Amino acid sequence: MPASIPRRNIVGKEKKSRILTKPCVIEYEGQIVGYGSKELRVETISCWLARTIIQTKHYSRRFVNNSYLHLGVFSGRDLVGVLQWGYALNPNSGRRVVLETDNRGYMELNRMWLHDDMPRNSESRAISYALKVIRLLYPSVEWVQSFADERCGRAGVVYQASNFDFIGSHESTFYELDGEWYHEITMNAIKRGGQRGVYLRANKERAVVHKFNQYRYIRFLNKRARKRLNTKLFKVQPYPK
């Protein structure tokens, strides 16, 4: 065993997260493009690349048009994940969660995918590094949110490990048709549904209806925003199991 590598940093049968180099800001041609270490870092990538990976790797097989910050997760020279950040499905809904929030005052983690072979805790580290990038590139963002989908069989373990606050859940209806999943908004919103909505409505009788909980998590980036949480609708609660 090389003396230069501490025993605690060696990856064995358990996929233990390791940091062998100090995380730092990553710049390219004088511009901030990411944050992290050689072993794990996030960097901005093109929209088309992020969408391609999400379409092929994410369980939903669908990207979100509202995303405008696309971060690749790298280990060494390998691209091992993608995080897409942007507006909520309804961009103006941020002010309903945190009072006095405009569209540029928050972000939603729309999509996240990380390779299964990555060490344990890699997802929470990637989120942590992404938040540092957001603070640097989008200083007007005061808070971020994301949803854990019950379809994945978990209640948001990754967000709990990333020190997000759990502020409630709601039940959403999904339609399963010909191997594709459709959110209820695709059925109900004529303009937003597009051709997928047209197809779903035309074949509604064949679709299988599912109801799943979606768990809402929020991470405040400053204390002022925390004080403006709309406590009439949301409150910080114990983590769901």
Curated annotation (Swiss-Prot):
Record flagged with keyword Transferase = yes
What does the record say mutating H58A does? Loss of acetyl CoA-binding
Keywords attached to this entry: Host cytoplasm, Host-virus interaction, Inhibition of host innate immune response by virus, Iron, Late protein, Metal-binding, Restriction-modification system evasion by virus, Transferase, Viral immunoevasion
Query: Altering S124A: what's the impact?
Result: Loss of acetyl CoA-binding
* Binding, Fe cation: Y59, D149, Y159
Q: Name one GO cellular component term.
A: host cell cytoplasm
- Induction behaviour: Expressed in the late phase of the viral replicative cycle. Mom gene must be expressed very efficiently only at a very late stage in the lytic cycle because its expression is lethal to the host cell. Expression of Mom requires the viral late transcription activator C and the host deoxyadenosine methylase Dam. Dam methylates three viral sites upstream of the mom promoter to prevent binding of the host translational repressor OxyR. If the viral sites are not fully methylated, the host translational repressor OxyR prevents RNAP recruitment by the transactivator C.
Query: Where is it mainly found?
Result: host cell
Q: Which domain of life is it from?
A: Viruses
Say yes or no: keyword Metal-binding present: yes
Span-the-membrane segments of this chain are none
Q: Which GO terms describe its molecular function?
A: metal ion binding; transferase activity
Q: What is the effect of changing R111A?
A: No effect on iron-binding or acetyl CoA-binding
| Family according to the record | Belongs to the mulikevirus mom protein family.
- Sum up the protein's function in the record's words: Iron-binding protein that performs methylcarbamoylation of adenine using acetyl CoA. This chemical modificaltion makes the viral DNA resistant to a variety of host type I and type II restriction enzymes by modifying approximately 15% of DNA adenine residues. The modification called momylation changes adenine for N6-methylcarbamoyl adenine and occurs just before packaging. Target sequences are 5'-(C or G)-A-(Cor G)-N-(C or T)-3'. Also usually modifies adenine residues in the host cellular DNA.
Q: What is this protein called?
A: Methylcarbamoylase mom
Biological source species: Escherichia phage Mu
